[in-house]
């Protein structure tokens, strides 16, 4: 996700509407917006069309109407996307969706992160790590687990904009720097 300020504002606006209607609507808006944004992300031609000023708003709205129908978007998300078309912001849908997802996670008390290991962890070990992190954070954590043999050993935990690098590769790098400095 980029630092697109307009995308953040639009996401907050849709989120505020959803908050007034309840958590179920927040989830529904998130699902609908995600389906539309995914279609834009997966189709470079669609993204180019939405960015291209040579196409009129009416032409973009016609394509958008078909997209919204295929995605099963409700009235509120459809109106929201039509507003984006009027303002020339349809190309920002993926960024708007990403920020909306962050707002929704914060509302639900969910933290998303990634745990990178050198080898694939067994399910029991993954569950134990997740449970321990949830206990320390005091919140529910959604972890994606990935394998990167280049870290040699240990783990790298990425949560939000924070990274905890407890990998063997990082430790060896620190040792190398200390040797170079003569410590």
Curated annotation (Swiss-Prot):
The keyword Transmembrane helix does not apply. GO terms for molecular function: proton-transporting ATP synthase activity, rotational mechanism. SUPFAM superfamilies: N-terminal domain of the delta subunit of the F1F0-ATP synthase. Signal peptide: none annotated. Keywords: ATP synthesis, Cell inner membrane, Cell membrane, CF(1), Hydrogen ion transport, Ion transport, Membrane, Transport. Its main location: membrane. It is a peripheral membrane protein. Pfam families: OSCP (PF00213). Gene3D superfamilies: N-terminal domain of the delta subunit of the F1F0-ATP synthase. GO terms for cellular component: plasma membrane; proton-transporting ATP synthase complex. It comes from the Bacteria. InterPro entries: ATP_synth_OSCP/delta_N_sf (IPR026015), ATPase_OSCP/d_CS (IPR020781), ATPase_OSCP/dsu (IPR000711). F-type ATPases have 2 components, F(1) - the catalytic core - and F(0) - the membrane proton channel. F(1) has five subunits: alpha(3), beta(3), gamma(1), delta(1), epsilon(1). F(0) has three main subunits: a(1), b(2) and c(10-14). The alpha and beta chains form an alternating ring which encloses part of the gamma chain. F(1) is attached to F(0) by a central stalk formed by the gamma and epsilon chains, while a peripheral stalk is formed by the delta and b chains. F(1)F(0) ATP synthase produces ATP from ADP in the presence of a proton or sodium gradient. F-type ATPases consist of two structural domains, F(1) containing the extramembraneous catalytic core and F(0) containing the membrane proton channel, linked together by a central stalk and a peripheral stalk. During catalysis, ATP synthesis in the catalytic domain of F(1) is coupled via a rotary mechanism of the central stalk subunits to proton translocation. Belongs to the ATPase delta chain family. HAMAP family: ATP_synth_delta_bact (MF_01416). This is ATP synthase subunit delta. The gene is atpH.
